[in-house]
Each structure stands twice: as structure tokens, then as C-alpha cells.
């Protein structure tokens, strides 16, 4: 039988070996954890740098894609000139319509009547005068003129004296008669006569 002294020696030896192995194990575990923590930091930092690099790479690629799409659009328009011609025609038509609308707004709503009286040379036998009346209506853009031959009964003795004077001027009775005649003429008859003349 072994003595108890030898048993205690084996027990102490076994405990010392166990403590040494536990210490080595803890040291190995701590070093492994430290290694993993350092690697994790490196991996995290690398992932950040990679994400930043990818973003920086994507920005110029997007710019290239945009420039490429613009080039394709321009080249399509260059090869198909019809689209450009249609756009130019639409712009011209829109500008023309706008100019017409502005012009029609600037014009007065009522027609202006210009009365021009030109006495012609009178002969001793006929004793007649011609009065030319030109009427212009701006809103409808149709211009027409009418010439009226007035007989001697239009003029009174005073108007004949004034007509033979060196400075011819229109008297009040003449103007009244002209305006009374114009009031009898309807604008519809004038426009119909102008349309018949143009046709």
C-alpha cells in the first residue's frame, strides 16, 4: 500500500498541472478574443471604406449614364429631323397666334370711318362734283370704298359760292347731307358689295 505522504505528493502534482493548464487555456482564450476583436474592427473599418468607395464609384457612373442618355437623345433628334421640324413649326404657329391675339386686343372695337372729300374739276356744261367716301372697318380687316356722285341739288347757292372760292372748304349743309346719306347706307350692304367685288 502506498503511504499517504506519496498520495499527497501526487495530488499536489496533479493540482499544479491542472492550474498550469487552466492558466494556459485562459491565456489562449483571452488572446483569441483579442484577435477577434481586432479583426472585427478591421473588418468594420474596411466595410466602411468599401461603402464609401462604392458610393464614389456610383456617382461618376450615374453621371456617365446621364450623359450617355443625353447623347442618345441628341443623336436620335439629329438622325430624325422631323421631330425638330415639328417643334419649330409648333413654336412658329404659337408665336403667330399670340401676335394675332395681341394685335386684335390693341385694335379698337368700333369701326373708324374716314371720310375724304375730293372735289373734281367742274365743267361749265355739267356743273357736277364728285365726292369720294372711303369707309374702313378695322376689326373685320376688310377695307372697302364707295364713290358717290352727288347732283347739283345737294348743293345750295352758298355751297356753290364756297366751292368756287380760291380756298375750297366743306360747308355745314354738305357735311349734314353726307352724314344723312351715310346713315341710310347699312354696313351689311357695304360688306355684301365688297364680298361680291372680291369674288
Swiss-Prot record:
Membrane topology, record value: Single-pass membrane protein
GO cellular component: membrane
Domain of life: Eukaryota
Major subcellular location class: membrane
Localization in the cell: Membrane
Any Pfam family hit: DUF4718
Name of this chain's protein: Uncharacterized protein C1orf185
Species this protein is from: Homo sapiens
Gene name per UniProt: C1orf185
Amino acid at each position: 500500500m502506498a503511504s499517504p505522504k506519496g498520495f499527497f505528493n501526487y495530488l499536489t502534482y496533479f493540482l499544479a498541472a491542472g492550474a498550469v493548464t487552466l492558466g494556459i487555456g485562459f491565456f489562449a482564450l483571452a488572446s483569441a478574443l483579442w484577435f477577434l476583436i481586432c479583426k472585427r474592427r478591421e473588418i468594420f473599418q474596411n466595410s466602411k471604406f468599401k461603402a464609401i468607395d462604392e458610393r464614389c464609384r456610383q456617382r461618376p457612373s450615374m453621371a456617365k449614364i446621364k450623359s450617355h442618355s443625353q447623347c442618345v437623345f441628341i443623336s436620335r433628334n439629329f438622325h430624325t429631323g422631323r421631330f425638330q421640324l415639328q417643334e419649330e413649326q409648333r413654336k412658329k404657329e404659337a408665336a403667330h397666334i399670340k401676335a394675332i391675339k395681341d394685335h386684335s386686343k390693341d385694335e379698337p372695337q368700333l369701326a373708324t370711318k374716314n371720310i375724304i372729300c375730293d372735289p373734281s374739276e367742274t365743267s361749265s356744261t355739267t356743273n357736277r362734283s364728285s365726292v369720294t367716301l372711303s369707309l374702313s372697318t378695322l376689326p373685320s380687316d376688310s377695307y372697302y370704298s364707295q364713290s358717290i356722285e352727288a347732283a347739283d341739288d345737294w348743293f345750295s347757292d352758298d355751297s356753290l359760292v364756297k366751292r368756287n372760292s380760291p380756298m375750297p372748304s366743306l360747308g355745314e349743309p354738305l357735311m349734314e347731307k353726307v352724314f344723312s346719306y351715310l346713315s341710310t347706307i347699312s354696313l351689311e350692304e357695304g360688306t355684301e358689295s365688297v364680298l361680291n367685288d372680291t369674288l
